[in-house]
């Protein structure tokens, strides 16, 4: 008997037609990359992906975070022989918790005697004969004994849910506006889960935001890296722009004008590094600048798609995802970001584009943006 991990990938990949092979290859490459510090062997059996791993538990923990993997099963490989399958199925039943079970059989090898239903009945009868306190429940069992008969037979009961989604790196790229808050890391995670490659930009307002605030953002990027691999982080100085806006624009327009500057800078950085889009952690109506009118005015400053994956999510739901992915505790550390230090008491919630453009005429937009882009620091996380 050999213990393996059966990797099941997202059903969406099956729907990719002629492109299915491209998605499978990318997922396989991502799996190999995340297992590079674990001794393993990739085994293919009639379209199924099995991984022989030196450390099963470590392998499970790593594979759970691979986008595109939706389930991991701990399987025992035996010879495709009915007696061997019976013995292993009985062991699985004895190791499982519960008083009811169901046997599910898949015969990829149609030369194996009997139908799938007949094999399930025979295995179920054998388990009942040897474990009298168990009973069969075909509708709502406490546990399953799963059997797949291929070149070998694979028996398993333990299934671990993974992150699902699409293989990372199969759906273009984006530049995430990463602040130190709760929302933006979750937005980045959700885009990455759909296969979008992440790059991040952070706007730093020294000395009003501390070096510790910058370190906090690096830590958040590092947590996201656990799901994606290396991330490019661009750190843009934003103090001079904020000072100019405060000095020359109306106080109730500060936030929306700052957001428009961020959009301009993000788009120029994106263009410079061949990044297709921009992503933000904005949610409709969550704060004053995230009204429908505010988002429309912000968007007007962008020259490429701006994605907002949290747009219809409640704050409680966003916080729940942040806890699940491991960013929440870092996000709530008490360090200010550039969007919170100069917030006006009564920000404009329904800005009008022409009024904002008129206010911006007091600023040398091109010079301010160019200087910020030129002084942007690059880090590989």
From Swiss-Prot:
What GO cellular component is one of the record's annotations?
cytosol
Q: Which UniProt keywords apply?
A: ATP-binding, Cytoplasm, Nucleotide-binding, RNA-binding, Thiamine biosynthesis, Transferase, tRNA-binding
| Record: residues binding ATP | 177-178, 202-203, 259, 281, 290
| Cellular compartments annotated | Cytoplasm
| Molecular functions (GO terms) | ATP binding; CCA tRNA nucleotidyltransferase activity; tRNA binding; tRNA-uracil-4 sulfurtransferase activity
Which function does this protein serve? Answer: Catalyzes the ATP-dependent transfer of a sulfur to tRNA to produce 4-thiouridine in position 8 of tRNAs, which functions as a near-UV photosensor. Also catalyzes the transfer of sulfur to the sulfur carrier protein ThiS, forming ThiS-thiocarboxylate. This is a step in the synthesis of thiazole, in the thiamine biosynthesis pathway. The sulfur is donated as persulfide by IscS.
Q: Which PANTHER family match?
A: TRNA SULFURTRANSFERASE
- Descriptive protein name: Probable tRNA sulfurtransferase
Q: Which organism is it from?
A: Clostridium kluyveri (strain ATCC 8527 / DSM 555 / NBRC 12016 / NCIMB 10680 / K1)
**Encoding gene (name):** thiI
